[in-house]
């Protein structure tokens, strides 16, 4: 079974293997240039590396590629404020449960 990109990236980030994660995301962007997923994940990686400007660029690209992609919108909302919560949305399941439509869409 092949590991989903989101799961692989989350695992690599948790293990602080940022260079490997960046390499995998770069490959994914080349293979799927119109996919929002690698850009959202690259935004998370950039935030973890304290590169907020690049993170926001990738979140915006992910959102531009697919405005219905909830994790990108959630991450833009979380990290576009002065004091972010520190939570990331790798997938829709990572968005708050209480009211996904209000908080994540």
Sequence positions of predicted segments:
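Helix-start (N-cap) detector for alpha-helical repeat units in TPR-like alpha-solenoids
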Residues: 2, 36-37, 70-71
